[in-house]
């Protein structure tokens, strides 16, 4: 498992608990897909974002006839968490009803980078019965645009 490879010293008991927690977060992302408003693409996406203190916020995609005004599941989850006062996050799970290994798009990755460190764990659903593919935000979005990037000298 990728998580074990990164930490190297996690006990089997802790790894099993982490796997259960990851599956639980993925289930939250899968469950919220049913609330998606997708009359045009019929492509449902769900996201579950866990705060540093363990609270979970979910989001689904909301399409608009003018596609540029559509909201992505990750954006909705982030907005819910931020409006509730959260600014530190530990994990994100993303799931789609149409394809396995769905990852956040570039725009969502940049939005996540506004609030999350490069080590945010991103769990990408591989479908029922499969282990999720795990990335860090830094792996998905290297060389992010940040406040430091925009500072003038």
Functional labels for PLM-detected ranges:
Residues 72-90:
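Short, solvent-exposed cationic patches
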Residues 44-51:
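Short beta-strand scaffold segments in enzyme catalytic cores
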Residues 61-75:
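Compact, glycine-rich, soluble single-domain proteins
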Residues 2-4, 8-38, 86-153:
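C-terminal binding/interaction regions
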Residues 53-64, 88-92:
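Glycine/charged-rich beta-loop-alpha catalytic/anionic-binding loops adjacent to active sites
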Residues 41:
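Active-site segments that bind and position negatively charged phosphate/pyrophosphate groups
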